[in-house]
């Protein structure tokens, strides 16, 4: 059975002090947690070290929101995998829709980043998803399958990779794909992985849902056969709400 994974993506929110306080509150809200669901937190770059220290011994993974595909050099504003690993990150989010939309991330650069993260020994959360226009055009399957196929091109082993389906039209809008809509795309993603790596690998890979997940809808979403947790945005900025979502995966 696949272990659920719930990751809070704090995006560009919270100072270092606020982030540390929120991480501490999340630990308290989770209590003993549950072995059936893995939890992670992705704060801003400046807060990674402090939040990582706050999370020590909690079992909650420290997650980075992005990275560069080069080890070092003249890449102003970027951060390397070595830097992230040095502060204790175990996962890196790659290809988030906001990175694709606002910062020119492409399937090609997503692929380069994935290879760099896996080579570093950290794990990847690969984000895929369609826009509202693409859904209305009926090309959701084509878009998502392409993002998976191109993102994983030349990647031989995806043992340390999680896929997050995030319909762009549902991120931060209050709109949520119905559990059946989400399940349909998750099944398509799993079938795409099956075509690339075989049935055993496709049944083992974890696929999160991201897009206005809340405590009130998490249990229904997580009950779907191909939904293995969530990549949580706004709701992860509230410790009680995030803890409730994690517990929905238990």
Swiss-Prot record:
Molecular function GO terms recorded: triose-phosphate isomerase activity
GO CC, alphabetical: cytosol
Primary location class: cytoplasm
InterPro entries xrefs: Aldolase_TIM (IPR013785), TIM_sf (IPR035990), TrioseP_Isoase_bac/euk (IPR022896), Triosephosphate_isomerase (IPR000652), Triosephosphate_isomerase_AS (IPR020861)
UniProt entry keywords in alphabetical sequence: Cytoplasm, Gluconeogenesis, Glycolysis, Isomerase
EC annotation from Swiss-Prot or TrEMBL: 5.3.1.1
Annotated localization: Cytoplasm
Enzyme class: isomerase
Residues bound to substrate: 9-11, 172, 212, 233-234
GO biological process terms on file: gluconeogenesis; glyceraldehyde-3-phosphate biosynthetic process; glycerol catabolic process; glycolytic process
A Pfam family annotated for this UniProt entry: TIM
SUPFAM superfamilies reported for this sequence: Triosephosphate isomerase (TIM)
Lineage top rank: taxon: Bacteria
Catalytic reaction annotation: D-glyceraldehyde 3-phosphate = dihydroxyacetone phosphate
Pathway: Carbohydrate biosynthesis; gluconeogenesis; Carbohydrate degradation; glycolysis; D-glyceraldehyde 3-phosphate from glycerone phosphate: step 1/1
Active-site residues per Swiss-Prot or TrEMBL entry: 96, 166
Cited function: Involved in the gluconeogenesis. Catalyzes stereospecifically the conversion of dihydroxyacetone phosphate (DHAP) to D-glyceraldehyde-3-phosphate (G3P).
Subunit comment: Homodimer.
PANTHER family attached to this UniProt entry: TRIOSEPHOSPHATE ISOMERASE
Similarity comment: Belongs to the triosephosphate isomerase family.
Name used for this protein in its record: Triosephosphate isomerase
Underlying gene: tpiA
């Amino acid at each position: 059975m696949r272990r659920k994974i719930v990751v809070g993506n704090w995006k560009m929110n919270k100072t270092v002090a606020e982030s540390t306080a929120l991480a501490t509150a999340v630990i308290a809200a989770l209590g003993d947690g549950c072995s059936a669901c893995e939890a992670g937190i992705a704060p801003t770059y400046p807060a990674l070290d402090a939040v990582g220290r706050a999370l020590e011994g909690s079992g909650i993974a420290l997650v980075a929101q992005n990275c560069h595909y080069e080890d070092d050099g003249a890449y102003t504003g970027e951060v390397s995998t070595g830097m992230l690993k040095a502060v204790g990150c175990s996962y890196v989010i790659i290809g988030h829709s906001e990175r694709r939309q606002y910062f020119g991330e492409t399937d090609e650069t997503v692929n380069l980043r994935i290879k760099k993260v896996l080579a570093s020994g950290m794990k990847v959360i690969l984000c895929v998803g369609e826009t509202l226009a693409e859904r209305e055009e009926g090309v959701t399957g084509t878009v998502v399958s392409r993002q998976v196929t191109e993102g994983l091109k030349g990647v031989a082993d995806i043992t340390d990779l999680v896929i997050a389906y995030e319909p762009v039209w549902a991120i931060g809008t209050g709109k949520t794909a119905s559990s059946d809509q989400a399940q349909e795309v998750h099944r398509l993603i799993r079938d795409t992985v099956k075509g690339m790596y075989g049935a055993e690998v496709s049944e083992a890979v974890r696929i999160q849902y991201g897009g206005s997940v809340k405590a009130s809808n998490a249990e229904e979403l997580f009950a779907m056969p191909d939904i293995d947790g969530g990549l949580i945005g706004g709701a992860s900025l509230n410790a009680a709400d995030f803890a409730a979502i994690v517990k929905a995966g238990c």
